[in-house]
Amino acid sequence: MKSKIWFAAFSFLLIANVCKAQFVKKHGQLSVQGTQLVDKNSNPIVLRGLSFGWHSLWPRFYNEKAVSWLKKDFNCNVVRAAMGIELGDHSYIKDPEFSKQKIEAVINGAIKSDIYVIIDWHSHNVNLKEAKKFFDEMSKKYAKYPNIIYEVFNEPDYETWQEVNAYSEEIIRVIRENDPKNIILVGCPHWDQDIDRPAEDPITGYTNIMYTMHFYAATHGKYLRDRTDEAIKSGLPVFISESAGMEASGDGPLDYKAWQDYIDWMESKKLSWITWSVSDKDETCSILKKSANSEGKWKEEDLKDSGIKVREYLRKYNKE
């Protein structure tokens, strides 16, 4: 009798782990219905995961094994590959081939790990010509994979919404010529704070478009949640493609209460969220210490407090 109970328990755990290991296989092609991100069965889905730091500053973490570890140990069901456009000697502008090699290592790692991946054009400025070329290439190469999400402009800083809108429409047009279905994320002015601007004048003529809001909990208070709530009420689909628990500078102490307030809010709204970042810079938002192996297998002592906390969140909420 005991052996039967043990076998049943073992079988249940095995099935659960197999289902967990096949996240994209289970949920498939994502789309937007109203303001909600949904899976292939039109069921609401919440993506939760981590963003890599700028590829041009922390390229050592841009590999398939690191992605696999984030899925296995952190329970990420999505990762974000943040391709630095101007910053660093190996930015996309200065070294496009190196940049694509690093970004594609994360993309391919996510596909192998059966999780979703955001291809993030990580810039604060308009680089239309370069962006069109890059997204044309990526959308031709990866259109057949439902894992793919495109983020066409990380954080516009001083551009107006009219400028961001015009830029985004051109990039969307390029992507949609090759990839008619996968989700596209569009940024908004003031480092993705002014989510009310696209709510007043959204992009039209395309489907499966979402708009990004970014927060750093120790800086951005309830006012930003209220602003986002109003945008959603107006019909705007929102995706939190970057966030964390410290100040907007990326440094300073973690504000655990403010962070939890944001987590509770996102969970109540079924908003997908990404935390910044997989890097080892000497600042609070970098989740890793210098001791961290480039390919994952990080021990507790390799994680900073932000890494320990976000892993706790991901393990708790990504139970599937």
Set out the residue ranges of the language-model regions:
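Bacterial Sec-dependent N-terminal signal peptides
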Residues: 1-22
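Hydrophobic alpha-helical segments, especially transmembrane helices
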Residues: 3-5, 21, 49, 81, ...
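Alpha-helical transmembrane segments and their juxtamembrane interfaces
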Residues: 12-14, 90, 252
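N-terminal carbohydrate-binding accessory modules
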Residues: 21-78, 93
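Extracellular glycoside hydrolase catalytic/binding regions
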Residues: 24-30, 54, 59, 77, ...
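Acidic active-site catalytic centers that drive phospho-/nucleotidyl reactions
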Residues: 39, 120, 242
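Aromatic-lined substrate-binding rim segments of carbohydrate-active enzymes
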Residues: 63-137, 176-178, 258-269
